């Protein structure tokens, strides 16, 4: 994650605290000593979304004395959940890091060589963690206390609440002596990767006895390609076995160790080569490529499935890359050992992708074997892993099978010539810059319960881009996916609408690239060239990285990892516009224009028809009629006016057609989905229906409902219009008092009456 971005988010947290507490002088002083940048967040809602504090915010609002600032919410969260851990665990307990919602809450324990057995009961997240004395005495002679990571036992829960582990009071002298012996081990500080991999382990729901194995399970070759749950950690060994009083033993050295597989070319390439691709985080995104549904079997690498009672991987979720043990691990028979030990992960484990930010600093790649290097030569330990079968859908993401290659993404920083060309296409001159309305506009959603599907517009200007994206998001919400009820489609969860936003952006840029390629522009926070000559810097274009993809599925995967930049911003609207232009290419965009000197952003930062057409149809043509119109000037010169060449997914209606200024063709007026971008009074908004039959069955057009959404109108409630085509309205009626939206509506349904159903008509 970019350090500069982290600093700006932290500074925004402090500014919000000072503002809400009325510390005006301190607030002004901070602005003077640390001025804001383009990455600063000025909206409390945006700040909550960036830090994923929506759950804590809603929980706080329900309290009698709610806290006023996000900083206090975070502070109370830490105090409530981690303030008393020190009373229940040993002195080496580490303070957990702040976790993102739906990600692992680390609850570290010191590694031990005792035979203490922890039993976790997670059937109900509101029950506390319990330890059974009877199970301890039963399993002391043959169980392991060291976890697979050597230092940490983590559990992931969908709730934001964590409970401390209750340890057994009055440990025996044997247990105490084992603690002392563990302290004497030359253990190095766990690496960052080891800490992260601690998030991946979660006990099974129900009663799990750690360290007790159910035995090996025979599996078919097909299973071995799907799940390598039973495998030994290559080149790693466990710590020494626990010493019994009066009979000290020297640990035996393992005589058989497996080696790390050599990275292979093609589909069988190992994760080591993938995680160390020069493209950094881009290549790692393949681990997040496949999502699963509750009914689909998880395709995990492993030797077979373990019984339900064995230890299991909990976190096959948004931050869990696959672990491919390689062909060597398949050929090596498992060696069973009950020696206690700390078995860190192998070097094959890729660095976890920063999916919400879409980037990963190279500095985070550290040696993943810093712990294991101190322990070589000890006994090998069979690593028990299993698959969680009771996960919530939003937390599930399938690890890819071995046939899935890494993302084929070509990335390069923008250069001066490309930036000049883009500005000329956008503004007509390379001296123009994006206005603040454009820079601060992203695709953040409405917080109102009845308008959760809606994208909020801060100020005028980029309304054409927002309306086009809104239409594509509605297409995904209403007519794709498995939402069974209309109300569920229009009241999506945060994860669902974010997913639909990523799909909508993917459709827009893929369509602009002729369904053959796409270019996604992302801000890096670092200036890549020095502006010289006839070019004026705006702080946005100079920081872009251009990511080119030629596969739609990989494009969707890539956007799901980087959707944070589009949704939370601050340049989401700019990034999408530039992505569409570069996907189409500046040369083809210029060829789409009727006049080569046209541009996509007009006066006062308004969107032109060319820009809206580019987002809706993939071509930046200047007109809305069908096909091409030839104009003969009379002297033999023929001027070609380019229109819409094919039927569009999202439609378009214009008030200009009511005034006979233009004519909207049937390719836009009758789209594939009943969603229309409406141009009225130099502003773009959206009109849509939930009935797909409206465009397929003429009988559905007799009486139907349309929903209207305007992201700029500070709309608080859903506006539903009932259109009746059986009751016609005279066209000679005084148009001065007729809402423009009704006039736009009648360009599609001639003379139809419109009932606003109690909503105030928008004039």
Curated annotation (Swiss-Prot):
InterPro entries hit by this protein: MINDY-3/4_CD, MINY3/4
Enzyme type, top EC level: hydrolase
E.C. number: 3.4.19.12
Highest taxon of the lineage: Eukaryota
Active-site residues annotated for this sequence: 463 (nucleophile), 683 (proton acceptor)
Region spans: Disordered: 154-368
Alphabetic keyword roster: Hydrolase, Phosphoprotein, Protease, Thiol protease, Ubl conjugation pathway
Biased composition (Polar residues): 252-261, 357-368
Pfam families in the cross-refs: MINDY-3_4_CD
GO-annotated biological processes: protein K48-linked deubiquitination; proteolysis
Cysteines paired by S-S bonds: none
Bias type Low complexity, positions: 267-278
Composition skew (Basic and acidic residues), residue ranges: 180-202, 346-355
Record's catalysed reaction(s): Thiol-dependent hydrolysis of ester, thioester, amide, peptide and isopeptide bonds formed by the C-terminal Gly of ubiquitin (a 76-residue protein attached to proteins as an intracellular targeting signal)
Phosphoserine carried by residues: 143, 220, 224, 296
One Gene Ontology term of the molecular function aspect: K48-linked deubiquitinase activity
Family indicated by similarity: Belongs to the MINDY deubiquitinase family. FAM188 subfamily.
Job description of the protein: Probable hydrolase that can remove 'Lys-48'-linked conjugated ubiquitin from proteins.
Protein's name in the database: Probable ubiquitin carboxyl-terminal hydrolase MINDY-4
Organism for this UniProt entry: Bos taurus (Bovine)
């Amino acid at each position: 994650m970019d350090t500069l971005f982290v600093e700006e988010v932290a500074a925004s947290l402090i500014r919000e605290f000072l503002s809400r507490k009325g510390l005006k002088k301190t607030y002004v002083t901070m602005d003077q000593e640390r001025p804001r940048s383009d990455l600063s967040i000025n909206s409390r809602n945006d700040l909550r979304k960036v830090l994923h504090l929506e759950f804590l915010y809603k929980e706080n609002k329900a309290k009698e004395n709610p806290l006023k600032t996000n900083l206090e919410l975070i502070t109370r969260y830490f105090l409530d959940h981690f303030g008393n851990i020190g009373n229940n665990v040993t002195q080496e307990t580490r303070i957990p890091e702040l976790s993102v919602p739906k990600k692992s809450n680390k609850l570290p324990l010191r590694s031990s060589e005792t035979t203490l057995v922890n039993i976790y009961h997670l059937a109900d997240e509101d029950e506390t963690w319990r330890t059974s004395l009877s199970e301890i005495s039963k399993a002391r002679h043959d169980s392991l206390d060291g976890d697979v990571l050597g230092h940490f036992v983590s559990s992931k829960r969908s709730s934001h609440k964590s409970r401390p582990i209750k340890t057994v009071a009055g440990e025996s002298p044997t247990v105490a002596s084992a603690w002392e012996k563990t302290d004497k081990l030359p253990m190095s500080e766990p690496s960052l990767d080891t800490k992260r991999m601690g998030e991946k382990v979660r006990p099974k729901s129900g009663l799990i006895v750690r360290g007790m194995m159910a035995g090996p399970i025979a599996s078919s070759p097909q299973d071995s390609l799907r799940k390598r749950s039973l495998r030994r950690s290559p080149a790693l060994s466990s710590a020494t076995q626990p010493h019994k009083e009066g009979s000290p033993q020297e640990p035996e050295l393992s005589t058989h160790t497996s080696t790390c597989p050599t990275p292979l070319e093609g589909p069988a390439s190992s994760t080591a080569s993938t995680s160390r691709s020069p493209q950094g985080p881009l290549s790692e995104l393949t681990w997040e490529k496949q999502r699963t549904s509750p009914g689909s079997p998880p395709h995990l690498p492993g030797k077979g499935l373990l019984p339900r009672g064995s230890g299991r991987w909990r976190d096959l979720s948004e931050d869990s890359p696959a672990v491919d043990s390689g062909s060597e691990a398949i050929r090596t028979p498992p060696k069973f050992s009950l020696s206690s030990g700390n078995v860190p992960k192998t070097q094959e484990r890729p660095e976890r992708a920063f999916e919400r930010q879409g980037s990963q600093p190279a500095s985070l790649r550290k040696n993943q074997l810093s712990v294991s290097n101190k322990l070589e030569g000890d006994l090998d330990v069979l690593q028990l892993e299993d698959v969680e079968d009771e996960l919530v859908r939003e937390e599930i993401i399938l690890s890819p099978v071995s046939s899935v290659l890494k993302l084929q993404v070509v990335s390069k920083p923008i250069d001066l010539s490309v930036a000049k060309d883009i500005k000329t296409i956008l503004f007509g001159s390379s001296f123009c810059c994006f206005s603040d309305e454009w820079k601060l506009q992203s695709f953040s959603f409405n917080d109102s319960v009845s308008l959760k599907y809606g994208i909020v517009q801060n100020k005028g200007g980029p309304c054409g881009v927002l309306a086009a994206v809104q239409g594509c998001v509605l297409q995904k919400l209403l007519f794709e996916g498995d939402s069974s009820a209309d109300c569920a489609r229009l009241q999506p969860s945060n994860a669902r609408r974010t997913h639909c936003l990523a799909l909508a952006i993917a459709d827009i840029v893929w369509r602009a690239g002729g369904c053959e390629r796409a270019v996604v522009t992302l801000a890096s926070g670092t200036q890549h060239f020095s502006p010289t000559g006839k070019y004026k810097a705006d702080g946005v274009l100079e920081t872009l990285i251009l990511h080119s993809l030629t596969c739609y599925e990989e494009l969707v995967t890539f956007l799901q990892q980087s959707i944070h930049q589009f949704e939370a911003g601050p340049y989401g609207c700019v990034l999408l516009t530039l992505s569409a232009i570069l996907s189409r290419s500046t040369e083809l965009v210029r060829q789409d224009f009727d006049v080569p000197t046209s541009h996509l952003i007009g006066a006062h930062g308004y969107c032109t028809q060319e820009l809206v057409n580019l987002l809706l149809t993939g071509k930046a043509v200047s007109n809305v009629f069908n096909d091409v119109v030839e104009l003969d000037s009379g002297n033999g010169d023929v001027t070609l006016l380019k229109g819409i060449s094919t039927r569009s997914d999202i439609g378009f209606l214009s008030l200009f057609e009511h005034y006979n200024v233009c004519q909207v063709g049937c390719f836009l007026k009758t789209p594939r989905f009943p969603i229309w971008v409406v141009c009225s009074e130099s502003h773009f908004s959206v009109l849509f229906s939930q009935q797909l039959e409206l465009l397929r069955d003429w009988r559905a057009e007799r009486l139907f409902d349309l929903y209207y959404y305007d992201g700029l109108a500070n709309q608080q409630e859903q506006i539903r219009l009932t259109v009746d085509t059986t009751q016609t309205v005279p066209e000679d009626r005084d148009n001065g008092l007729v809402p423009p939206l009704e006039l736009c509506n009648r360009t599609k349904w001639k003379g139809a009456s419109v009932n606003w159903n109690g909503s105030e008509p928008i004039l």
